[in-house]
Amino acid sequence: MARAWVCLAGAAFFLSCLVLHSRFCGSLVSRTFSFHVSWRMEDPLFRLDLGWPKNSEYFTGATFCVAVDSLNGLVYVAQRGDNIPKVLVFSEDGYFLRAWNYTVDTPHGMFVSGTPFEQSVWITDVGSGPYGHTVKKYNSLGDLVQVLGTPGKKGTGLNPLQFDNPAELYVDDTGEMYIVDGDGGLNNRLVKLSQDFMILWLRGENGTGPAKFNIPHSVTLDAVGRVWVADRGNKRLQVFDKDTGEWLGAWDNCFTEEGPSAVRFTPDGKYLIVAQLNLSRLSVLLAPPSGSIGDCSVVSTIQLADQVLPHLLEVDRKTGAVYVAEIGAKQIQKYIPWHSRTPAFGA
């Protein structure tokens, strides 16, 4: 009997070491796993890469967003603060490469698009200074290439196109762009632009009904031509047809406590990864097949420490790694698929 109790205690200690990890101000970051009735633990989907980044001292401000250049193995981070680099560039294995701080006022969201030979780094800027209320395109070295919106001036206009606190964007493989505008500003809308930045369709206004928004905060696409928007203030995900902008439905049953602040799909299209800012929680949702979106179903969650505040996230489309921008903890954390060959505890 004594030997049985010793084995049981040892197993409990080992399990606690797996589930808990201290990373933020000495607080515990816990993983929420699913259990069978028989108390056998299911395989978790993601694990924290404790070795990323190698150079965390470069996080000197509030890390609002992160973007991944999957083709070239680069990770871009945008942070806010005075007299600090606004954009940091890391390798996918966590080494700091360079920083730039040109014509960036107050970054909110970012996205990387392009080819192996030419990469574009898009940043939404919500600042009130001369660079704010814009969506800007940079090359990988930080040179400004394109500006959408009226720099330093918020507005609702469509010709020319104006923004007020544009929250985030997504660029598909054809170069067409989806922008959610804005984060508490004049506009509550989803805008689709062509490759040459002409408006193809626009949906939304302030409200709670179908195709209306209250802080559209994040946007992404699935593999079957649907646009997913994190309608944060209305505590739901709204879904639209990629080509026509037709409203296809909404998920709200997963967000009774707080709305989603970020949404992305895993590369295989099986799951959505969603962040809830003030709950400091990441949720993995089961993605619907083509056709009706059905109801929201939570597969697993990762509960972070209080005040970590995951704001936006990105998924590496090649490796499946999830990078989370945490404005409270002022860091980026990387989660890798559980069965990845990358060591969980770094090198």
From Swiss-Prot:
Entry-listed glycosylation sites: N101, N206, N278
Signal sequence range: 1-22
Segments forming a coiled coil: none
Placement of NHL repeats on the sequence: 47-93, 150-196, 200-243, 294-338
InterPro entries: 6-blade_b-propeller_TolB-like, NHL_repeat, TRIM-NHL_E3_ligases
Keywords assigned by UniProt, alphabetized: Glycoprotein, Repeat, Signal
Gene3D superfamilies per record: TolB, C-terminal domain
The organism's place on the tree of life at top rank: Eukaryota
Listed name of the protein: NHL repeat-containing protein 3
Species in which this protein is naturally found: Mus musculus
